[in-house]
Amino acid sequence: GDRQAPEGFYHVTPALMNPNSSYHLSFNMGFPNAYDRANDRTGSFLMIHGACSSAGCYSMTDEYVEEIYALAREAFKGGQKSFQIQALPFRLTPENMAKHVNSNNFEFWTMLKEGSDYFELTKQPPKVDVCEKRYVFNRAVAEGERFSTRTECPLTEMPRSLATAFATRPSSRAISNLIV
């Protein structure tokens, strides 16, 4: 890649789809999201598109963007309100994380790993919120509480079944055991 495109969790709605793109087909991935704005990241029109060339966007062949675009279009026709994009640097397995433990981005990638692990465990997109300028995943807050991007996180709870599944996943300890 061009090392300019952001990483994180994004949601695409029908309004972000662009069938008239100069790059064949495209859709705006919704950058900046709440996390990006809380961390003063700016920009706009970060697109996923065809034409296989880009600066700051995610490009792919026309064939691949047509496939993704068709799936999104049909999901929206079927009543789905949005779809999630997980823009990750690599598969966030313990082995891959161990290879990058000295990266300046390791702490950020560890945060993203929680959302990625949820998807791998459940095959469902994680519920994503932001508080204290960080992502939080699959958390429920008490009635009357809410997440705020720049303030302290409210008390949260993870559903018991999910907490049990997370307790059995390869963790940070597994990553440290792989570091040579």
Segments from the language model and where they lie:
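Exported/periplasmic cell-wall-interacting domains
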Residues: 1-153
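C-terminal non-catalytic accessory extensions
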Residues: 157-180
